Amino acid sequence: MSFLFNRGQKEKANEGPRTTEVILTPPPDAKPGPQPELKEGDEEKLQELQQHVLDYIAQHPCPEAYLSYEEQWLANPVLYKRYLRATRGDLRASKRRILDTLEWRRDFKPEIIPPDEVAPEAETGKHILCGFDREARPILYLRPGRENTKTSPRQIRYMVWSLERGINLMPPGQETLTIVVDFNGTNLSTMPSLGTARHVAHILQTHYVERLGRAFVCHMPKFISAFFSALSPFLDPVTKDKIRFNCPDMTEFIEGNQLDDQFPGGAYPYQFDFDVYWKALVERCGIQPDGTRKVPSA
């Protein structure tokens, strides 16, 4: 939801020295929680789902230029489990949704978005990956008060680029992100249309299935509450259940030294610096100038 952001954010002024260092590696004590156990009959459904995808690919081959990226995506050991969980075991729905995403990825090519293409969207820090929650989920901050561009396809590509980098940062055993949306400084003049917000919500829910672990919506004024009320019918129940609004203390879920000190319980005195942030993230994720990675995608 990067395009929810606007200029002129006034953040809490915390005393003491600040740091531009970005936390891109989970602390030793952060451990992924146990994965949901399979239910009776799920193994057979998973095999059928995988075969359905293979049969589809045999009839609709991937373009050669994108084939290696599709193979990496399909090789994720829990890919099929995520789709089955997202549909609560509905095999027919799982088949439809995974093929929808396969075709979307062939068209959008999220793994190979060049950094320079989306760098202008990153200059004000409206999306920041920094820190990990107690279960080693990467934390993605979305700050509407730092919007610096007009609504465009590039904004959506930057949202997807940020999600892909969050996935790259996940340690083994972790499949989800924690998202913190900070509406501090947001005003009505820069709010997106409901249609635009729905489009992004569709991408997140449809093509990044079961990637949201937790979400916190902070510093939310009343007019944003009305916006969420209008958007709510377009959010699936699973997504809505993971969102917490104006949480008074986030340290139940995120260690204070991993949480930006702009938020309840946070103690990490982070100061955004575009050059430092961009260089650190691109290098940590192994992103090359053409958008490809030096290491296999997580």
Model-assigned labels for residue ranges:
Residues 1-298:
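Basic, amphipathic alpha-helical/coil surface patches used to engage anionic, phosphate-bearing ligands
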